Amino acid sequence: MSWFKRKDKKFKDPEKKSIPDGLWDKCPSCDEILYRPELEKNLSVCHHCEHHFRVAPQVYVDLLLDKSSETHLYQNLESKDFLKFKAVKKYTDQIVTAKTKTGEKDAIKVYDGKINGESVVLGIMNFRFIGGSMGSVVGEAVSRAIQKAIKDKVPFLLVCASGGARMQEGAISLMQLAKTSTQLAKFAKNGGLYIPILTDPTTGGVTASYGKLGDVILAEPGALIGFAGPRVIKQTIGQDLPKGFQRSEFLLEKGFIDHIVSRSEMKEKISTLISLLT
């Protein structure tokens, strides 16, 4: 037992190894700890419960459009503080912060490209840019995209992700509901195929306009889709809401959307719809 009396340690304490930030994510649905490189390889879909994480627009570009077929359109559009909106943080400062955070000019990107060889116009919203809110730039970009689809006689696809109209632009943001809906009416009159893809979340003015005006409405699994949020509705009516209320599975059951499509199957589903409906 002489080793109890040893004064000098013969063994060193193991060195603590630092783990780089950003290597792990926790699934908000099943609480599984996920290795980020593997998660991204799986299109940011949890391999345990199929929860679809929110992703950047570039993920949808790579996922949906044929390689090297895309052309980025309307890159010169930028938001302005028409109303000189004053809040805790000025609107102009919010725009600068969002641009720095996302590397984008606003909450939407528009491309023309091909899906399995078929030409399309594709719009993709970015929830990380001021909650994907619809202001003058989003409305103008969507309108121009529809006009291009009419001119080129190609389908128009729009990946929706938004908290609704951009309150910092007041009535100007609300005008975009009518503006985009009018353009979609023209598109339909010209026989165009419009497919919105509703992702988590799609709410507010986007749901009340182009989010629900599709010929075929697709949604990702588990996406929050509605006008007002569930918390607001619960407070207003004073009642508990049904399980899964405003999730894509609930909306499919009630007939508000047409198909729920996993991210990995989205391109082939859209390609099939285009071949059947054009």
Question: What is the predicted function of each stretch?
Answer:
Residues 101-107, 132-147:
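Glycine-rich anion/phosphate-binding loops
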Residues 113-125, 141-165:
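A structural preference for short, pocket-lining loop segments at secondary-structure junctions
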Residues 24, 43:
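Residues immediately within or flanking Cys/His clusters that coordinate Zn2+
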Residues 163-278:
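Conserved catalytic cores of soluble enzyme domains
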Residues 1-15:
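N-terminal alpha-helical interaction blocks
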Residues 27-30, 46-49:
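Short cysteine-rich clusters marking metal-coordination/redox-active sites
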Residues 13, 25-26, 53-110:
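An N-cap/entry alpha-helix motif that binds or orients negatively charged groups
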Residues 33-34, 52-53:
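Cys/His-rich microdomains that often coordinate metals
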